[in-house]
Structures are given as C-alpha cells and as structure tokens.
Amino acid sequence: MKVAVLGAAGGIGQALSLLLKTGLPAGSELSLYDVAPVVPGVAVDLSHIPTAVKVAGFGADALNEALKDADIVLIPAGMPRKPGMDRADLFNVNAGIIKTLAEGIVASCPKALVGIITNPVNGTVPIVAEVFKKAGTYDAKRVFGITTLDVIRSEAFVAELKGVDVATVKVPVIGGHSGTTILPLLSQVEGVSFTDEEVAALTPRIQNAGTEVVNAKAGGGSATLSMGAAAARFCMSLVKGLQGEDVVDYAYVAVENGDAEYFAHPVRLGKNGVEEILSYGELSAFETKAKNDMLETLKKDIKEGVDFMA
C-alpha cells in the first residue's frame, strides 16, 4: 500500500503525515511531496518513529517519482485561509496548484484513489475531475472531496452539548464543504434529541467552525490539526476499502441525478473506491429548507471549478 501526500510540509500535511506514519498498515509506503525545501527533513523526522511504514520525501522537481505506483493520493497542498478570507477567496490561488498536481496524478498513477483537501473543496474537486476527463482517464469512483472535518466537528460539538460519550456519536453531514453548503443532519443523530433552538444554534456553529479556528489563531494559521486528523480518518477508510472491508463513510463525490453534480453523501467504499452512493435518508423540515437554500451556492462553486478548466 502506497499513500502519497501532496503538500506534506504544510500544517495539515505534517499532521496528516504523522498520523499516517503511526496508523497505516505495516509494510505501507508513505510518500511526502512538497515544493517547500523542508520536505526531506519532514520525512527524516517521521522516519525516526518506530513503525513499519517506510517514509520518503520528494521536492519540487520529483512529483512523478513521489506519485509512482501510489494507491491513494491525498492533497492538502495550497494556501491556507487567513482572517477575513472565506474559502472562495482561496480559489484563485489554489485552483492552479490543484490543476498541476492533478496532471501529475494523471501521468504517474491514474488509477489511484484521490482525496482532495485543498479548499475550496466545492470547486477543487471538479477541477481534478476535469483534468482526468481531458486525459481520458476519469473514474468518478476514485475522486473524493474529503469532508470528514465537518463530520468530526459535528461529533465533537454534539457530544459536548449533550454530555455524551463522543465515541457513541455519529452525525451524518451532507452537501458541500464551506459555509451554508455544509449540512449536518442532526435529526438523524441516534440516542439524542435536539430542540429547535439547539438545531438553529448548532448548525451554523458547525458551518462556521473553520472561521472559529482562523480567528482563534489570530492570523497564525487555520484548522491544521483537526483537518489532519479528519483526513487521516478518511484515508484509513479508503485503506480498509482497498483491503476488501465493507466501509461506509461520507465524502463529496460526483453524483448522477442528485441534488448537484457533486454532493457529499454516505458512500460504501471498496476496492474500486466508491462502490455505492447511499441515500442520505429523510430530512427534517429545517434540513430540507437549509438544503434547498444552499443549492444555488453549491452549484455556483462547482461551476467555478468546471469553468476554470474550460
């Protein structure tokens, strides 16, 4: 099993790489790529951790080598959000980075499962898909926007609010991965119930949790540690799927005849990536209105990504 992390020297990339070094199955390879000159040092640093995962670092001119024979590629590369910026402000900076990296994947490991972390995910996932389409190697089952951060935040916030064991909390989150496009389905959380007031307060807290971190770090960064944990969790779901286990997780994927061209759904994962896109079930009146209200924004975000590649 070979996992490549593109953007491994950044805040998310380092946290993610650490968790993969300690969490991937024995015998796995962890390939770290970044344009930052520190990346070989990150690889050396991680290599001192005694686990049976081999680590190698690759600099700016070695993208193809970093990606060769990768089974899974995770992309946290790009510019992080700063105070006053929203995810849309990142598009102009990060769209070009994502395009270049996707072209590298097409050249070196077109059959890999590709997990996209780089914001704005609503628009960067379509860019990757369009690069694959242009090359004639697109497989919708193998391209994912990683929305796990919305799920783990929801789990943490619900457990905190209700005073329950976080290990027992499961919160479905659908839609997109920024602002109001993030839709936690609190009506489907088992074992707890919420008042209308709690739903009205908790939903925007989940949607704006990234801003909460950006502001709390006072210009010193964005959500790197929690995002690293979220991406590692999703990567382990992909690994289990590749190993033949039956895994259901949430991801932003291409959907046919769905709410939008791309939408976060529960998905059954397996050896081909997405084996099945599952229904997100019944929505409450609040959730139905929230979904209908945000679809225009989500579709605009998607169009921006597609148009960038036109």
Curated annotation (Swiss-Prot):
Residues annotated as binding substrate: R81, R87, N119, R153
CDD domains membership: MDH_glyoxysomal_mitochondrial
Keywords: NAD, Oxidoreductase, Tricarboxylic acid cycle
Enzyme Commission code: 1.1.1.37
Catalytic machinery residues: H177
Annotated binding of NAD(+), by residue: G7, A8, A9, G10, G11, I12, G13, D34, N94, I117, T118, N119, M227
GO molecular function, one term: L-malate dehydrogenase (NAD+) activity
Reactions this protein catalyses: (S)-malate + NAD(+) = oxaloacetate + NADH + H(+)
Any matching Pfam family: Ldh_1_N
InterPro entries referenced in this protein's UniProt entry, alphabetically: L-lactate/malate_DH, Lactate/malate_DH_C, Lactate/malate_DH_N, Lactate_DH/Glyco_Ohase_4_C, Malate_DH_AS, Malate_DH_type1, Malate_DH_type1_bac, NAD(P)-bd_dom_sf
GO biological process: malate metabolic process; tricarboxylic acid cycle
Cellular component annotations (GO), alphabetically ordered: cytoplasm
Family classification: Belongs to the LDH/MDH superfamily. MDH type 1 family.
Protein purpose: Catalyzes the reversible oxidation of malate to oxaloacetate.
Entry protein name: Malate dehydrogenase
Annotated organism of origin: Pseudoalteromonas translucida (strain TAC 125)
Lineage start: Bacteria, Pseudomonadati, Pseudomonadota, Gammaproteobacteria, Alteromonadales
Gene: mdh
